A protein has these predicted regions:
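Extreme N-terminal starter segment of soluble prokaryotic enzymes
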Residues: 1-5
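Short, well-formed alpha-helical segments that are part of the catalytic scaffolds
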Residues: 7-30
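Acidic helix N-cap motif at the loop->helix transition within catalytic regions
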Residues: 15-18, 40-49
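Conserved beta-strand positions in the Rossmann-like core of class I SAM-dependent methyltransferases
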Residues: 32-35, 54
Length: 168
């Protein structure tokens, strides 16, 4: 089965980081945490999940920070989440199916649902697709100081309704 490196950038995320990292157990084979200057327990929590916790001086550039995180990943694929992201149990099963499928299909980029709007009950109500899982090949380069994105490359696949941002 392919290996997946979760690459995250964090700062002062002690309230949500443990929940996020707990939901990727079994899916991510490696966890990379890049801390940009936390003053709370974020790094302590990160170290309870991985020994691959790096300091990165904040340069007011999200793309530079994500590129640094991706440069530390060693898996076949690089997966990114924000600390407030949650993968629900039913979505986790879909991700595991996707991981098995990657052995045969090998897309360069897997687009996943990304919730950005919520109703009054906190349920996700507005989505778009983002590049969430990228083959580690040197072409997965983040651009954009704010609202960073990976420049399109290679062949794309769309994951079946995988992952809700900040829900749960």
């Amino acid at each position: 089965m392919v290996s997946i490196s979760l690459c995250m950038i964090v700062r002062n995320e002690e309230k949500v980081l443990g929940r996020c990292l707990s939901c990727v157990r079994g899916f991510a084979d490696e966890i990379i945490i890049v801390d940009t200057g936390s003053t709370d327990r974020t790094k302590e929590i990160a170290f309870s999940f991985t020994d691959k916790v790096y300091d990165f001086k904040w340069k007011d550039d999200f793309a530079a920070t994500r590129n640094f995180a991706f440069s530390r990943g060693t898996g076949d694929y690089l997966f990114w989440l924000d600390a407030d992201d949650v993968i629900r149990q039913e979505e986790w099963r879909k991700l595991m199916d996707l991981k098995r499928r990657l052995d045969m299909e090998r897309p360069d980029v897997v687009m996943m649902k990304y919730a950005v709007g919520y109703d009054g009950d906190g349920a996700p109500s507005f989505f778009f697709y983002r590049e969430r899982l990228l083959r580690r090949c040197g072409k997965a380069v983040w651009k954009g100081r704010i609202h960073e994105a990976v420049e399109p490359f290679g062949n794309h696949d769309r994951a079946p309704e995988s992952g809700d941002r900040g829900s749960g």
